[in-house]
Regions:
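Active-site/catalytic core of tyrosine-dependent DNA strand-transfer enzymes
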Residues: 78-127
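Short, basic (Lys/Arg/His-rich) helix/loop patches that form interaction surfaces
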Residues: 23-26, 75, 113-155
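Basic, Lys/Arg- and aromatic-enriched nucleic-acid-binding interface segment
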Residues: 2-7, 11-44
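C-terminal secondary-structure termini that scaffold catalytic or DNA-interacting sites
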Residues: 1, 5-8, 102, 180-184
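The alpha-helix within a helix-turn-helix
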Residues: 37, 48, 154-155
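DNA breakage-rejoining catalytic core of tyrosine-based enzymes
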Residues: 1-19, 69-79, 92-94
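Catalytic-site neighborhood detector that most strongly recognizes the C-terminal catalytic loop/helix
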Residues: 66-70, 156-184
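Conserved tyrosine-mediated DNA breakage-rejoining catalytic core shared by Y-recombinases
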Residues: 40, 49-86
Length: 184
């Protein structure tokens, strides 16, 4: 296992925090968002804009294009993420999977307030601000510490430079192994 290189713990969601938050009494939509975000490393905006056609159940992948970069998304799903998305597909009354009771796509700030509430519960004696982008950074750091290649991590997160925009990582088994082993 590699050591911690990139960020200090105030900048990313740790595995310990992830486990604490996922067991809190918070809205299910937020908990689903948290699970998918930490497991896939996708940007919040990409998760919030997931549509039915972005879920390939046969290949067990999220597909489409990233909102920010327009890069191709082809993210292999672990069992828990797949189960969450299957449930959301089954219950979806509109094309988008993360919508409020009126059918409107959630805004990042809606989930941000629950994320901040969770951190206040974890650290009641500290003023600590972690925004929801720390979920994505936590995924990156978590996978990196468990020896998943940078290429695989960046491909899963749709984070590629102009020099490697044709990068394609079909086999994401290292990520799935680490996710399934440590994020039960």
């Amino acid at each position: 296992m590699r050591g911690h290189l990139f960020l200090n713990q105030n900048e990313y969601l740790t595995v310990e925090e992830f486990h604490l938050i996922r067991n809190m009494d918070l809205p299910q939509d937020f908990l689903d968002f948290l699970e998918i975000g930490f497991r896939t490393g996708l940007r919040a905006v990409d998760i919030l804009n997931l549509k039915k056609e972005n879920i390939n159940l046969k290949k067990e992948r999220i597909i489409g294009n990233a909102q920010k970069t327009n890069l191709s998304m082809d993210v292999a799903l672990d069992k828990i993420s797949l189960d969450i998305l299957k449930r959301r597909l089954k219950n979806a009354e509109v094309n988008n999977l993360f919508v409020d009771k009126f059918g409107n796509i959630y805004k990042p700030g809606y989930f941000g307030k629950y994320y901040e509430e969770a951190h206040r519960n974890i650290y009641p004696d500290f003023l600590l601000h972690k925004d929801i982008t720390s979920i994505r950074r936590g995924n990156r750091d978590f996978l990196y510490m468990h020896d998943v290649s940078i290429a695989e991590i960046e491909y899963r997160q749709c984070f590629r430079s102009a020099y490697d925009d044709d990068l394609y990582v079909e086999d994401q088994s290292n990520s799935l192994y680490v996710i399934n082993k440590f994020l039960k």
